[in-house]
């Protein structure tokens, strides 16, 4: 098996530029002359990383415009990346990249040619983690993981892909994570493949919560794996990650040691912080009312930082929902006769209160949309997360919805709308911070069927919420969204698209 690639250090802009000059055997003075700079002092400040982000950005743009070094695309990308490292630091850069991965903007590079190697202690045989998980899923009735650390996306992706519903092997994951510094963002991104599952339970351990010896246990990358064979036989394994892509599987493991370790972890749980809290309810009509009411309470009076593909239903006056709701409820047989009208009336009351909260509260709402998804809504009347029991919005309703959002964007200082820049990939995860309560992660492009593919989870871990807000304000709003004037122009374009649509 191939060795895992050695990660390259993150360079500041000055360091990256020095590297390029060394590669081309150029001096700083020579580059300054090639760029026709009036003062050579500025380039030395850039190289020493003492000139500040704005000056470095201006220098980078001037360098690209002059094309005096004939930079390759790879070199341009490296310089662009180093600008971000200089702006937010190496830890902040990693944190932002993890958040982009969470949104689905930055894909993890495939590492299929460097598989996780698993060495078995019993016979010295070798396999891959992927093969080991697939075999476990085939040969067992149930598998229970108790994990510390192991926060690598490839590990959880492999587990999620092996234990599919088709395998009929019940799985559960109890996960303990040490979450100091910026680790929390990377960890949530890493566990995303299993994060929404009700069978995943995560606990965060804050810095200095335990003594050094106890802390080392939670910092270790280990798995205790309890298997129940199809014939009822029980067996347990202990797995340790001993290299970046190499695991040691101890079989059979010492059952007494494992039992004592799990008992200790269970007793420590009150001093930990639960990673998530789900609010989804079982699918019956009454539960949808409770579900909607839960969101109303979550939104009420809070500052909100939201990443959505297109317009949320809570931004639409319920008068504009009635036609779509009545038609859809009838087609889907969502309630009957008088019961249906009573249900619609209750939904109307809750949504009116939600709508009025967003339009009148004196705490800011910030929402970033995907232009592509909003254009699809303008043309078809179908939201990316359109409720399965609602019909599409009619043309005139769409025009009114979009015109109202445009007016709020221009006139309401507490209601701030944005669009991602064209070069930013549309997110595949919707994330919303309800300040003071938690951050909601929602799978995009579902039909809100709580008995189907729709799922969300509320992360109440305070460090994650703080880091997401910093990312939203200092990264997304600073460099990834259109200006206010450009946003208004996009709304004008959307309104015209709705007016001229055939549907």
Predicted regions and their residues:
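Short coil/turn segments at secondary-structure boundaries
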Residues: 32-34, 58, 142-147
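Short amphipathic recognition helices of helix-turn-helix/homeodomain-type DNA-binding modules
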Residues: 1-10, 55-115
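Recognition helix of helix-turn-helix/homeodomain-like DNA-binding domains
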Residues: 36-55, 81-82
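Long, C-terminal catalytic modules of enzymes
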Residues: 481-503
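DNA major-groove recognition helix of helix-turn-helix
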Residues: 21, 46-47, 59
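A short, Lys/Arg-rich alpha-helix, primarily the initiator
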Residues: 1-28, 33
């Amino acid at each position: 098996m191939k060795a895992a690639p050695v990660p390259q250090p993150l360079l500041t802009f000055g360091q990256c530029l020095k590297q390029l000059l060394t590669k081309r055997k150029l001096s700083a003075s020579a580059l300054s002359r090639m760029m026709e700079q009036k003062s050579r002092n500025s380039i030395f400040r850039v190289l020493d990383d003492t000139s500040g982000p704005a000056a470095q950005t201006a220098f980078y743009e001037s360098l690209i415009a002059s094309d005096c070094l004939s930079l390759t695309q790879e070199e341009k990308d490296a310089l662009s990346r180093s600008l971000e490292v200089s702006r937010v630091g190496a830890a902040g850069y990693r944190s932002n990249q993890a958040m982009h991965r969470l949104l689905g903007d930055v894909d993890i590079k495939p590492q299929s040619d460097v598989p996780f190697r698993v060495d078995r202690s019993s016979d010295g045989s070798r396999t891959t983690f992927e093969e080991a998980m697939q075999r476990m899923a085939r040969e067992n009735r149930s598998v229970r993981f108790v994990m510390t650390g192991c926060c690598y996306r490839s590990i959880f992706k492999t587990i999620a892909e092996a234990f599919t519903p088709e395998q009929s092997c019940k799985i559960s994951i109890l996960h303990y994570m040490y979450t100091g510094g910026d680790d929390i963002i990377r960890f949530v991104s890493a566990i995303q493949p299993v994060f929404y599952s009700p069978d995943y339970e995560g606990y965060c351990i804050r810095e200095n919560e335990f003594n050094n010896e106890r802390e080392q246990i939670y910092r270790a990358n280990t798995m205790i794996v309890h298997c129940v064979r199809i014939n009822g036989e029980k067996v347990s394994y202990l797995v340790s990650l001993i290299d970046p892509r190499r695991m040691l599987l101890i079989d059979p493991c010492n059952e007494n040691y494992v039992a004592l370790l799990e008992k200790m972890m269970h007793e420590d749980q009150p001093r930990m912080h639960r990673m998530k809290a789900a609010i989804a309810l079982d699918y019956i009509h009454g539960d949808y009312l409770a579900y909607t009411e839960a969101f109303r309470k979550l939104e009420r009076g809070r500052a909100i930082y939201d990443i959505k593909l297109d317009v949320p239903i809570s931004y639409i006056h319920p008068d504009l929902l009635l036609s779509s709701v009545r038609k859809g409820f009838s087609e889907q047989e969502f309630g009957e006769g008088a019961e249906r009208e009573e249900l619609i009336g209750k939904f109307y009351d809750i949504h009116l209160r939600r709508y009025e909260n967003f339009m009148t509260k004196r705490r800011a709402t910030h929402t970033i949309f995907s232009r592509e998804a909003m254009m699809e809504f303008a043309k078809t009347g179908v939201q990316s997360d359109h409720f399965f029991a609602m019909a599409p919005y009619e043309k005139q309703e769409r025009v009114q919805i979009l015109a109202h959002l445009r007016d709020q964007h221009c006139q309401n200082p507490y209601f701030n709308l944005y669009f991602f820049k064209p070069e930013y990939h549309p997110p595949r995860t919707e994330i919303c911070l309800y300040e003071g309560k938690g951050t909601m992660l929602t799978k995009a492009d579902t039909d809100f069927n709580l008995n189907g593919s729709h799922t969300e989870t509320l992360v109440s871990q305070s460090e994650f919420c703080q880091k997401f807000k910093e990312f939203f304000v200092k990264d997304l709003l600073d460099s990834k969204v259109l200006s206010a004037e450009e946003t208004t122009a996009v709304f004008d374009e959307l309104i015209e698209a709705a007016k001229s649509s055939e549907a």
